[in-house]
Structure formats: C-alpha cells, structure tokens
Amino acid sequence: MLAVLSPAKSLDYESPLTTSRFSEPALMHESALLIEQLRQFAPADIASLMHLSDKLAGLNVARYAQWEPVATPQNARPAVLAFNGDVYSGLAAQDFDDADLDVAQQHIRILSGLYGLLRPLDLLQPYRLEMGTKLGNPRGKDLYAFWGDIITGHLNQALTEQGDNVLLNLASDEYFKSVNVKRLAGRVITPVFQDEKNGKYKIISFYAKKARGLMARYLVKERISKPEQLLDFTVAGYGYCPELSTENKLVFRRPEDLSQ
C-alpha cells in the first residue's frame, strides 16, 4: 500500500532533528525550473499570485533567492520533519525509529507544488508554492499543467516497487488533482473522516487533516499492507462506518464527546 499526503504551509527548521538520515528528491530539475520562474517576481507580484501578506511575500521571495539546485543537510531537512501542519501533527514522525522510517520511505509519498512528489526523508528547502497556484508556465496555465503526468508516472513506479497496486489517498482535493487517476496503475482508496458537531456529522477541516496524518502513522506503525486492515482504524476515537462506505471510499466517524 502506498499513501499520499498533502504538504503543509507551516514549516519547522528550528527543532532538533531526530534522524541523520536523508534522501534526495527525484525531481529537482523540475523544481529548479519553477524556482527560476518564481525568481522573476517582485514581492508584490508574489503577494497577488499567492494571496499572501506583504511580510509573507517578502519571506518567500527571499526563500526563492536562497534555494539551491543541490539540497544538503546544511540547507534542507527531511520533508517529513520540515512540514509542520495538522497532518504532520497526526503523523508525529519525530518518534519514528529506523524501522518505521524504512516503512515510511517505501509506503508514503508527499505531493508538492514545487517538488512534485517527495519521499519522507527527501531533503526539503524552505518554500511556499501551493499546488492550486495559477502560475502560468511554458507547459500551461497552472501547476497541474506543469506537472502533467510526471507525478503519476513516479507514483506508478513507487507502486511497483512496494509490491501492490493500492494507493491510499490521504491528500486534499487540491493536491490529489495533480494525480491522473486514469493513468494510475492502481486502485485508489479514499478515507473520509467526519466529526459530530451539534448532533450532525460533517468533515471539519482541522480534525480531518489531523486524522489523515493519524492514518498514515497507523499505516507505518502497524505495518498495514491490506485494505481490509484499514477498517480496524480506531485511533483518536474514530470508527469505521460500513453502512456509509463503499469499496474505495472508507467513512470513519467520531462522536463529539471523543473529539475533545
């Protein structure tokens, strides 16, 4: 089973690293093309393009200027320890041991607007470039056009290498749109996490993001290899709802009293 995650906007380059291991991103040449284009923008242009404050736009212009075509432990850190949002709070990779990291490296991929597709230990330099950014480029009007079938091709390769054809979609719609499902050599299973609020169940973004990370952690820690094993996921109070689920859409619900 191969799981895909979204990246996070917030980054952590301050906390102590919990591993000295790292790997090199496979698509750095493509990333360098995007950086070259982003370096042409003034801070005001970045603010407009990405809907950022002037302060954040200035920070990211500086990041693009400092980005290097060769990542090293001196200018980057493993992606799974650099991303710092709700998904990664649930994943909590800081306590992974070497065996866990081996499993994660083989069975988890992170979609990225700048890097295309990352393994957990791939070195990540600070950046901001969401997949939905309407960045016109020589390949088309946006990043979906830029990446085309490149991401899908690398996912197919990863599916082959890890031994089956099941892709666990733990990414947001914005990021999973970068995958050409028609050309994907695998079955896509998408978990849906709903929380109860005022007596009604719905997807609450903060909780759903963290739950995706929790399921990725479950995959790693429990060495999950078969889709039916996912049905036993009961972490943080969630439970599988067979009456709402289909073969490829797995619905998990959590009562309000268990979300506190």
Swiss-Prot record:
Q: Which PANTHER family match?
A: PEROXIDE STRESS RESISTANCE PROTEIN YAAA, PEROXIDE STRESS RESPONSE PROTEIN YAAA
Q: Name one GO cellular component term.
A: cytosol
Which domain of life does the UniProt lineage start with?
A: Bacteria
Gene Ontology biological-process annotations: response to hydroperoxide
Which Pfam families does the UniProt entry name for this protein? Answer: H2O2_YaaD (PF03883)
Similarity comment: family membership: Belongs to the UPF0246 family.
Q: Which InterPro entries match?
A: YaaA
The name of this protein is UPF0246 protein Tola_0968
